[in-house]
Amino acid sequence: MKKILERSMEGSGTWQGLVLVGIVTWICASSYLKFTHKFRSLLQPWVARQVVGGVPLILRIQKCQNGVLDAFFSGLSCVVSVPFYTAFLPLLFWSGHGRLARQMTLLIAFCDYLGNCIKDVVSAPRPSCPPVRRITATKDEEDNAMEYGLPSSHTLNTVCLSGYLLHYVLSSLEYESVSIQYYGFALACLLVALIAFGRVYLGMHSVVDIVSGLAIGVLILGLWLTVNEKLDDFITSKQNVSSFWTALSFLLLFAYPTPEHPTPSYEYHTAFNGVTLGIVTGVQQTYSQFHHEAAPRIFSPELPISSYLGRVMVGIPTILLVKFCSKSLAKWTLPMVSNALGIPIRSSMYIPKLKGYASGKKTDEPKNSVGYLQKLCEFLSHDSFDIDTGIRFFQYAGLAWSVVDLVPSLFSYVNL
C-alpha cells in the first residue's frame, strides 16, 4: 500500500509539473509569435459581419418590447450572472452540499476564464446601439456591455451550470425515474432558451454570440462531466494541491490574452481566479473536518433551518470583514514587495498615489540593476504591471478561504 501511495504521489507531481511547464511555454510562445493577433485577424472580420447582418432580426424581436418583458429578461439575466452565483456559493457550502459547491465554483471559474479569453481574443463588437435598443437595468449589466460580444457568457454559463446541476440531482437520486429525467432536461432547456432569447431581446448579443455560447457550453459540459470526479478527488485527497493551484492561478493571470481595447473581462477573471484558489486551498486543508460527504446537510436533524439561518447570520459579516482586511493587507504589502523586487507597478483604482505612472527603480539607475523580473516584464511587452490585479486577486482569495475554512471553524466553535 505504501508503495502504491508513493507511486501515486510521484505520478501526480509529474503531471502537475507538465501542466505548469506547458502553460509557461504557451505564454512565451504566444507572446513571441503573436498568436492572439493572428487569431483575431482571422476571426474578427467574419464575426463582425455576422453581428451586422443580425441587426434586422434583433430589431424585429424588439418590436414586441414592453415593460413586463424588459423587467422579466433583465431579472432573469441577473439571476444567472456570475455575481449572483458568487453570492450564492457560500450559502451552498454552508448548507452541507460541499461537493456540489466545489464543482460549481470550479466550473464557473473555468467557464468564466475560457469565455472571457475567447471574447478578448476575437474582440468582436456587440450589436450597434442605436439602432438596437440596449437595456442595462443594473450596474453589472452596464459593465457587461463594455465587454466584447462573442461568445455570450450568460448562455455559456447557463448551459454548463444547469446541465451539471441536473446531472448532480439525477445521480443523487436513490432510484432512476424516466419522468424526472425528462422534466429536468426540459426545464434546463427552457431556462437556456429563455436566457438566450433574453440576451437578444435586451440588445446585448447577436445570434452568432448566442450560438457560439451554446456550442462552447455544450463542449465544456461534456468535458466537465468526464473529469469532475477525478478533479474533486485530486482537490480533496492528493498532495501538493495548494502549491500547485497557487502556481497555476499565478500563471493564468499571465496567460490571459490581451484584448484589442481594455474591457472588464480581465478583472472578472482575476476575481474568480482568486475565489478558486481560496476555495481549493481551504477545502484541501479542512476537508476531513467540514466538507466530507457525511457532513450534516440542511433540513436534516443535524442541521435544521434555524441552525442554517444562524450560520448565514454569522458567516456573511465574517467573510465581508475578511474581504476588507485582505484588501487592506494587499494594498499595504504588494507595493512594498514589488518595489523591493524591482517590478514596475501602477494603480488605476486602489492606490491613488500610483495612478497614471509606474513606480519602481529611478530612471537614472543602471538598467542592469532591475533584475530578471523586470526583464520578464519587458519580454511580455508590459512597461509596468497594474497592482490592482494583485490586490483584487488576494482580496477574493481571502474571502473564499474564509467561506470554507475560517467560517466553518466559527460554526464549530458556536455549535451551529
Swiss-Prot record:
Spans traversing the lipid bilayer: 72-92, 104-124, 178-198, 207-227, 241-261, 266-286, 302-322, 393-413
InterPro entries: P_Acid_Pase_2/haloperoxi_sf, P_Acid_Pase_2/haloperoxidase
Enzyme class: hydrolase
Effect of loss of the gene: No visible phenotype under normal growth conditions, but mutant plants show increased sensitivity to ABA in stomatal closure and decreased sensitivity to ABA-induced inhibition of primary root growth.
GO molecular function terms attached to this record: hydrolase activity; sphinganine-1-phosphate aldolase activity
Keywords for this protein: Endoplasmic reticulum, Hydrolase, Lipid metabolism, Membrane, Sphingolipid metabolism, Stress response, Transmembrane, Transmembrane helix
Keyword Membrane: yes
Membrane topology reported for the UniProt record: Multi-pass membrane protein
Function comment: Functions as a sphingoid long-chain base phosphate (LCBP) phosphatase. May play a role in the regulation of LCBP levels and be involved in stomatal responses through LCBP-mediated ABA signaling.
Membership in a protein family: Belongs to the type 2 lipid phosphate phosphatase family.
Protein name, per record: Lipid phosphate phosphatase delta
Organism listed in the record: Arabidopsis thaliana (Mouse-ear cress)
Gene: LPPD
